Amino acid sequence: MFTGIIEAVGNLSAVNINSQGARIVVSTGLLDMSDVKLGDSIATNGICLTVVAFDNSSFSADVSNETLTRTGFVNYQTGQAVNLEKAMLPTTRFGGHMVSGHVDAISEVLRINHDGNSIHYWLSMPNDLAPYIAEKGSITIDGTSLTINALKEDQFRLTIVPHTTAQ
């Protein structure tokens, strides 16, 4: 489980897609890798990935065809920035919400409005997920825990505050 509070931004240093899925290598930037072990989970843009190899500054993970398709990971490219979060511990304080790392859908940004220091994003709402998207409820976008501020037909609005934008 994760919290949706991003610990670091890394970069994809390798993306090797084959018929069974993909093997990726993520350069972890400022993510503390000192306590990482084989088999640990690291959310990468909100996608729960299992560490199959690692060193002090990177980890490798296998990505299934299902994950490639459902998450849009198939379009990711070498050098792309990704949000990173290690799995939470039972003693961890979390300021986001419980995040499984299992991606349900891809949403499209429909429009962006600036309001003072905040930024409002209107996103498309997949029809099959509409019953589960509630105003003032939590949602995870690219691994970031956010609050749904408004609903309108087949859309929902998120507001990003300056602190989140700065991170």
PLM feature spans:
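Conserved loop->alpha-helix
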Residues: M1-Q167
